[in-house]
Amino acid sequence: MIYFLSDAHLGSLAIERGWAHQKKLIQMLEMMSEDAVSIYMLGDMFDFWMEYFIRDKKKRQYNPFFKELRKLAKKGIHIHIFTGNHDLWTFGGLHKITGAEIHFSPCTIQRYGKTLYLAHGDGLLPSNWEDYYPSRVRKKINRFMRLKKIFNNSTLQFLFRCLPPKIGNKIGYGWAKKSRLKEIANPCPFKGEHKEELVLFAKEQEKQGNHRDYYIFGHRHIELDLQITPDSRVVMLGDCFQQWTYAKLDHHGRLTLHNYEGEDEQ
């Protein structure tokens, strides 16, 4: 089996009982390890991740999660971690700690006779995306894209890494909490297949002849399995803090969505 999950947002100040949240995620990974060949984590596994030039003691809170990933790797399970828009600031440290292969951009893989396009999903738009939305929505998307450019600016990344971790984390985790609370207050449900950016992106890829059997995304915190052509589907992974959604690909090439129940959080 190959498993896919995303958006755990570990360390979030907006998620109560953080240790119980991390424990349930570890239990979920242990369940997957029973028959997993590979596990793909498609971004935002951390609510905020920055690798400073000075040692960051706050990352100790993730030690149980790191230990589980190393244990999975020792069992021969291939671990892949994609960066998201909350945890893109890794410069080799995350790989060193976990042994996972880190992906900074979308990738296409071939498994069990199927072609899969994997991405966190932030910033993926069809080329003519402005034709689909009114001015208010276009402005919102443009703001996000500008922010994404700032986050990826190497000079600004260097300067932020120079900050004492205590100050940087206060800024980073505070920003992430504000973003999460805003999402709770103003949820953005599925927009429909004619307006959902990632669905439009996948449809355009198919029209251009870039066929994939499955497009698998995180980012949107919605659970979705949508047929966009007779032989192509878009799958969105929900999250791993509320919905506890994951997908698995069996050796016949069948992809299915599931919700992990696990033990009740205490």
Set out the residue ranges of the language-model regions.
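Short, well-ordered, mixed-charge alpha-helical segments that flank or form enzyme active sites
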Residues: L88-G92, L118-A119, L125-N128
